[in-house]
Amino acid sequence: MPELALLEEVVDKVRPLLGQGKVADYIPALASVDAGKLGIAVTTVDGETLGAGDYLEPFSIQSISKVFSLTLALTLYEEAEIWSRVGKEPSGHSFNSLVQVELERGKPRNPFINAGALVIADLLQSRLGAPKHRMLELVRQLSQNDKVCFDKQVADSEYQHSARNAAIAYLMKSFGNFQGDVDTVLRTYFHYCALKMNCADLSKAMLYLANRGKSITGTELISQVQTRQLNALLATSGLYDGAGEFAYRVGMPGKSGVGGGIIAVIPGELSICVWSPELDGNGNSLAGTAMLEHLSQRLGRSIF
């Protein structure tokens, strides 16, 4: 377990970077966040959690939720059913690209861009009676926090600005790769993105990625092989168009969200969550990436 002093050092080290990024402003509910926040939490495979900075302050997890939705789909479907509808390749286009969906005849490149996550939400919607409730149940169980909830204001705000995601869903539907009612699936998808969690919650919830598929309670969520495969996808496609840069600087599987959170994993050891709302040009937390880079250097850890 890293010492508390190291986590505090990591937070202090990146503080001068504040002001260099830009808070996501495409929906009003995200634009109002205090840009000066910085937090980090780590959870070890032994179940210990340590944090520094604003690590107990909840934020909108946004695309980090795509890890949970894919994990949930893996517990409900045969893998062939999932991968026949969504690919495993890095995108190279923006996370909300319509062009790629058109060129590749309705099959999204990976589950971590919007098109791919919408297909996963469609799969969950068709298999579960109450997909929003099931997701809430899962993340509360994984984080050991019954107070985790959806931020209704964020979900509503995203729905009001959903034209592009609706266009992606209808385009996939035209290619036969979207079964459900678009409006219903969009509402489910936006609720997933609007989950509100803090760094401690997320570092605990993602521990299964570091612990061969076993959650913080020791329950097997997905198999060891599936965990390794999921980490491989996170390493290649978890950070939008910044995945290569992140692999170079941090060297861990990770997933970011435009709320400023990033989760990362050192397999066999620990799961990490950092948060700083200001984003770089790729939509990844600027100071968050720097925190992970500094931590990986100080710990001497990389998967490469």
From Swiss-Prot:
It holds the Pfam family Glutaminase. This is Glutaminase. Belongs to the glutaminase family. Keywords: Hydrolase. One of its GO terms (molecular function) is glutaminase activity. The gene is glsA. PANTHER family: GLUTAMINASE. It comes from Shewanella baltica (strain OS223). Substrate binds at S63, N114, E158, N165, Y189, Y240, V258. It catalyses: L-glutamine + H2O = L-glutamate + NH4(+). HAMAP family: Glutaminase. The keyword Hydrolase applies.
